C-alpha cells in the first residue's frame, strides 16, 4: 500500500534542502547506507546541498555507497553528457565518497545483459538501496523505464522513445546526437528501495504526477507502480502539485 508524504516548495533551493533532509536522516542512521541516485537538472540543488552539508561537518560520505539509475548506451564515462561524468562533476568529486563505492551502468559494455546482472548483484551484495532518488518523465517513465506492455523488473537495456530523446536534446547539440538506447534499473530494482524520494518541478508535470499516484497502475505509465511502495516522499513545487492533495498530507492508497 502506498504511503505518500507530500512536501511542497517554492524554490529549487527549498527543494534541495527538503530532499537533503531525507538523505541526511538515512545517512546519519546508517553511515554505510546505499543511495540510489539520478541525473538531470532537478536534482542539482540537492547535490549542492549535500556537498555543503558535508563541508559543514553535518554529513560524512566516506562509508556511503551509491548506485545510479541509468546511463546512455554508447557514451564513454568521460563523455560530456554521460551520467557518470555528470555525477563526478556535480557530486562525487566534491564529497568523501570512495570511487569504488560508486557504480553507474556501463554504457560501453560489450555484453550488456551480463553487465546488467552484475549491476544487480552488486546492489544485492551491498544489501539493497536504502534511499532512491527519482524524477518522472512527461510520459510517466522512471529511470529510463519507458511506457510498454509490461513492468521490466531488473536492470536492462531499453530503446528510448522519441519523447524522451526530444526532452533530453537540450543537453546535446542536436537530436541526432541523443543516444537511441540506454541501460536502466528496472522498476523491480527501484521498488526494492526501502525509501523513495521523488523531486518534481513545473506545471507541465502536474497531469502526469497526478496520473502516477492516483490513476490506474499500468506499464503504459511506468511510474504508477509506485502506488505499491510503502514509503514515498514527493517534493515538488506548487505548480507541479496543482492536482495533488495538500502539503504535508500523508496519503495511503
PLM regions: where:
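Short beta-strand segments
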Residues: 36-40, 68, 105-106, 133-136, ...
Amino acid at each position: 500500500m502506498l504511503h505518500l508524504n507530500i512536501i511542497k516548495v517554492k524554490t529549487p533551493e527549498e527543494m534541495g534542502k527538503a530532499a537533503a533532509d531525507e538523505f541526511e536522516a538515512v545517512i546519519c542512521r546508517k553511515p554505510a547506507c546505499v543511495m540510489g541516485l539520478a541525473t538531470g537538472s532537478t536534482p542539482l540543488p540537492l547535490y549542492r546541498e549535500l556537498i555543503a552539508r558535508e563541508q559543514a561537518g553535518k554529513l560524512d560520505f566516506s562509508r556511503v555507497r551509491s548506485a545510479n539509475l541509468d546511463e546512455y548506451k554508447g557514451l564513454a564515462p568521460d563523455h560530456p553528457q554521460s551520467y557518470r561524468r555528470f555525477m563526478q562533476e556535480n557530486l562525487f568529486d566534491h564529497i568523501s565518497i570512495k570511487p569504488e563505492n560508486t557504480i553507474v551502468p556501463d554504457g560501453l559494455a560489450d555484453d550488456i545483459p551480463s553487465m546488467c546482472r552484475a549491476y544487480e548483484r552488486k546492489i544485492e551484495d551491498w544489501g539493497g538501496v536504502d534511499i532512491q532518488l527519482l524524477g518522472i518523465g512527461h510520459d510517466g517513465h522512471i529511470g529510463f523505464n519507458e511506457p510498454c506492455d509490461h513492468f521490466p523488473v531488473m536492470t536492462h537495456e531499453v530503446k528510448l522513445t522519441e519523447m524522451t530523446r526530444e526532452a533530453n536534446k537540450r543537453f546535446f547539440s542536436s537530436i541526432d546526437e541523443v543516444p537511441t538506447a540506454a541501460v536502466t534499473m528496472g522498476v523491480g530494482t527501484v521498488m526494492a528501495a526501502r525509501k523513495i524520494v521523488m523531486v518534481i518541478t513545473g506545471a507541465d508535470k502536474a497531469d502526469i504526477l497526478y496520473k502516477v499516484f492516483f490513476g490506474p497502475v499500468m506499464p503504459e505509465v511506468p511510474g504508477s507502480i509506485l502506488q505499491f511502495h510503502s514509503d514515498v516522499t514527493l517534493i515538488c513545487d506548487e505548480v507541479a502539485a496543482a492536482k495533488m492533495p495538500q502539503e504535508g498530507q500523508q496519503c495511503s492508497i
